[in-house]
Amino acid sequence: MLEIRNVTYAYGERVILQELNLQLKEKRIAIIGSNGCGKSTFARLLNGLLVPKNGDVLVDGLNTRTEGKAIRRKVGFVFQNPDNQIVFPVVEEDLAFGMKNLGFSKDTIRQRTQEALSRYDLLQFREHPAHLLSGGQKQLLAISGVLVMEPDYIIFDEPTTLLDLRNKRRVAAAIDNLSQTVIVVSHDLDFLAGFDRVLVFDDGRVVVDDIPSIAIPEYVRMML
């Protein structure tokens, strides 16, 4: 479970998130809201990429202030632009990087890399320059890079925003088939209809917290 206890976050004097208190237990959670409302900042707090000014974020009881490395193994993060997650130019090397960094054995690295590439039909590109992949393939590579670490939670920041319709469907299907707890920041409301819970952010606060059939129409009314 993810717990947010009286969390406030600010950039300098500008308060981005205000006194948030939440428990996130559901398997599929969506975060929506207008640009600048604090949703992406909130997502980064959940895996320790950012640390709150006040309050605490707990992941299965571990505090992001003191257990950052352990939490980043438990909570994977897929960025909006998959180019931001490409570390090495060759696909196979890029997938192996995180595991090598954490001391995984060569056999484990080889096995998990092959499984991840096979899952999304990327095996033929294992020695391919990563930057030459299509947008959809890059996003699937980014998802693979998180999956090889075997996290318990995966956070996606606008995973379909930069993709055409065909690749949006492909990436959405990949996310839908994940066994991990998934938290998605998105403007793609159709994609979120099957989720368990939707948090609507406005001005640094959660103003709606409900199932999609209630939260999404309320958000649409707010935007009118």
Curated annotation (Swiss-Prot):
It comes from the Bacteria. GO terms for molecular function: ATP binding; ATP hydrolysis activity; ATPase-coupled transmembrane transporter activity. The keyword Cell inner membrane applies. Its EC number is 7.-.-.-. Gene3D superfamilies: P-loop containing nucleotide triphosphate hydrolases. Probably part of an ABC transporter complex. Responsible for energy coupling to the transport system. Belongs to the ABC transporter superfamily. GO terms for cellular component: ATP-binding cassette (ABC) transporter complex. Keywords: ATP-binding, Cell inner membrane, Cell membrane, Membrane, Nucleotide-binding, Translocase, Transport. It comes from Photorhabdus laumondii subsp. laumondii (strain DSM 15139 / CIP 105565 / TT01) (Photorhabdus luminescens subsp. laumondii). ATP binds at G33, S34, N35, G36, C37, G38, K39, S40. It is found in: Cell inner membrane. Pfam families: ABC_tran. Its main location: membrane. This is Putative ABC transporter ATP-binding protein plu3849. Residues 2-224 form the ABC transporter domain. It is a peripheral membrane protein.
